[in-house]
UniProtKB/Swiss-Prot annotation:
Record-listed Zn(2+) binding positions: H446, H510
Gene Ontology annotations of biological process type: thiamine biosynthetic process; thiamine diphosphate biosynthetic process
Residues in coiled coil: none
Protein name: Phosphomethylpyrimidine synthase
GN (gene name): thiC
Subunit composition and interactions: Homodimer.
Pathway in which this enzyme or protein is active: Cofactor biosynthesis; thiamine diphosphate biosynthesis
Length: 643
């Protein structure tokens, strides 16, 4: 892989499409208890309700925003300099970390001295890595268990609430019908949360910093914020919070450049990616990762065994603990926020996969299975797990305990190998928690719908409610090219049952490396699944956006319908294919039914008739039916009549 010349040139910049604000949206910041807690949100402005519908004011709707400074017109974006170090002051003021005099990893030092890669390096970083002072633990879980509410926790509480209280208050003061309007727009169906404590009749009406602290201390949620990634905006992953979505990017040995991967990252977060995993396996993994981290406002995850394998020329049996340890330190000092580590692939489970239709499909799982068989012993990941914990808590890197034995077909779902590994991951979680290391659990995979809840229930039981992070699951194997849909079905279900973060699947799954369009399709599909899960659980305020869009639809506010949706561009494009003129944006019909058969237009006609006659809507319908009956009989009572 060669570097993209434009990306490395003096005027390198991200794709203009990734930094333009979304239609009728602007970046706003909500300040917390201190001036440097400025939480970003996207404000979507709305048009007033037309006079024919009552002439109401429709205040802006606020939504969760993962795009970082890229969608802020006032921010100066220079990818060669990276993003501002948002959390640097918070990290330093705690007094439990130190700036290192140099790089701790042997590989990092070798790479820094390698003249062949000099032109590829990120040169905008002018600080050295930080690490916990000897004997200190700098994880957010450690602070939470000591009763400390960190700035990150307050930031998250503000972010999760999405200014819902302010929105409802603005409705109340919008006019004479404000109280009624607020009650209508704030209405939400009761959810079924399957035991998640934040929801239900006695649940929360808003997320508080103390609640964030409690959930992190309990291990039910994680805040993936490496101290060497101060550019990241704090976010939380847990079943009592909004369901999150991860996007996978990364180069391979045969395609893609550093520049393309940075573009994919900014594109993914524009459309709602809450975290991004860099799964690069080609050349220049180290340099690609540095560029991505320095320009990412969301947590970055990796699978360190991929790079470790590159260091031994792809021979799994040549991997050692020493090489892997050095790779962990290298990536921790770059700022990786969570590591996928397949420590649950034990020697005793490998033979169980022989009965499978598709064997071991996890890349990391197959690497470790091969190592176990070659050496006929437990993997160094399992044997050195406590040593890994020592590294994690020195930088606040979170575990994403990998499901190396996940099923690669619905035939293999919920088999002995998969569930055996899951039980081991639960045991490893307890060890990680003993060190106050934040931990989430990765899950399948390919699972038919009737077996999905069993996966969730066993994970909650065996892993003691540690956050579950699942790939889909795909609910059928018959749709290559459409696996974003086969998996989106499973993602919505398992998100409802309790999964905290969904790993997106693109249309290219099983077929090739996704491009930017595939990334967007995957993100939108999974934001939809995550939101459906939030609605089903009864997350406080989850229905606000649905209510706002439904009201806009009923009032034929077309632009507001587009802009309140997950993909305004696509909605506008589809509408304009058949009704491209500006006049169609205020029409009281669309191309589906036309002007005479629009159900919402008919409903409005009934309401107007009721108002004119001084009767209720039901009475108006009855009167209207009587009039139409007389007309029908006068015309000969024929179903089909000449015009």
């Amino acid at each position: 892989m060669n570097a993209n010349p434009k990306f490395l040139s003096a005027d390198a910049h991200v794709d203009e499409a990734a930094v333009a604000p979304l239609p009728n949206s602007r970046k706003v910041y909500v300040t917390g208890s201190r001036a440097d807690i400025r939480v970003p949100m996207r404000e979507i402005s709305q048009a007033d309700t037309p006079d024919s519908f009552g002439g109401e004011k429709n205040p802006p709707v606020y939504v969760y925003d993962t795009s970082g400074p890229y969608s802020d017109p006032e921010a100066k974006i220079d990818i060669r300099a990276g993003l501002p170090a948002l959390r640097q002051a918070w990290i330093e003021e705690r007094g439990d970390t130190e700036a290192l005099t140099g790089l701790s990893s042997d590989f990092s030092r070798e790479r820094a001295a390698d003249t062949a890669t000099a032109d590829l390096r990120f040169k905008g970083l002018h600080r050295t890595p930080r690490r916990a002072i000897a004997g200190k633990n700098v994880s957010q879980m450690h602070y939470a268990r000591k009763g400390i509410i960190t700035p990150e926790m307050e930031y998250i509480a503000i972010r999760e609430n999405q200014r819902r209280a302010e929105y409802l208050e603005s409705l109340k003061t919008s006019g004479p019908n404000g109280e009624k309007l607020a009650a209508m727009m704030g209405r939400q169906h009761p959810g079924q949360a399957f035991g998640a404590s934040a929801f239900g009749p006695n649940g929360l009406t808003a997320i508080t910093p103390e609640f964030v602290r409690e959930e992190v201390a309990r291990g039910r949620a994680i805040i993936p914020n490496n101290i060497n990634h101060p550019e990241s905006e704090p976010m939380i992953i847990g079943r009592n919070f909004l369901v999150k979505v991860n996007a996978n990017i990364g180069n391979s040995a045969v395609t893609s450049s550093i520049g393309e991967e940075v573009d994919k990252m900014t594109w993914a977060i524009r459309w709602g990616g809450d975290t991004v995993m860099d799964l690069s396996t080609g050349k220049h993994i180290h340099e690609t990762r540095e560029w991505i981290i320095r320009n990412s406002p969301v947590p970055i995850g990796t699978v360190p065994i991929y790079q470790a394998l590159e260091k031994v020329n792809g021979k799994a049996e040549d991997l050692t603990w020493e090489i892997f340890r050095d790779t962990l330190i290298e990536q921790a000092e770059q700022g990786v926020d969570y590591f996928t580590i397949h420590a649950g692939v034990r020697l005793q489970y490998v033979p169980l996969t022989a009965k499978r239709m598709t064997g071991i499909v996890s890349r990391g799982g197959s690497i470790m299975a091969k190592w176990c068989l070659a050496h006929h012993k437990e993997s160094f990941l399992y044997e050195h797990f406590e040593d890994i914990c020592e590294i994690m808590k020195a930088y606040d890197v979170a575990f994403s305990l990998g499901d190396g034995l996940r099923p690669g077909s619905i035939y293999d779902a919920n088999d002995e190998a998969q569930l055996g590994e899951l039980k081991t991951l639960g045991e490893l979680t307890q060890i990680a928690w003993k060190h106050d290391v934040q931990t989430m659990i990765e899950g399948p995979g390919h699972v038919p719908m009737q077996l999905i809840k069993e996966n969730m229930d066993l994970q909650l039981e065996w892993c003691d409610e540690a956050p579950f992070y699942t790939l889909g699951p795909l609910t059928t194997d018959i749709a290559p090219g459409y696996d974003h849909i086969t998996s989106g079905i499973g993602a919505a279900m398992i998100g409802w049952f309790g999964t905290a973060m969904l790993c997106y699947v693109t249309p290219k799954e099983h077929l090739g490396l996704p491009n930017k369009d595939d990334v967007k399709t995957g993100i939108i599909t999974y934001k939809l699944a995550a939101h459906a899960a939030d609605l089903a659980k009864g997350h406080p305020g989850a229905q606000v956006r649905d209510n706002a869009l439904s009201k806009a639809r009923f009032e034929f506010r077309w632009e507001d319908q587009f802009n309140l949706g997950l993909d305004p561009d696509k909605a506008r494009e589809f509408h304009d294919e058949t009704l491209p003129k500006d006049s169609a944006k205020v029409a009281h019909f669309c191309s589906m039914c036309g002007p005479h058969f629009c159900s919402m237009k008919i409903t409005q006609d009934v309401r107007e008739f009721a108002a004119q006659q001084g009767v209720t809507d039901d009475e108006a319908l009855k009167k209207g039916m009587e009039v139409k009956s007389i007309e029908f009989m006068k015309k000969g009572a024929e179903i089909y009549q000449r015009q």
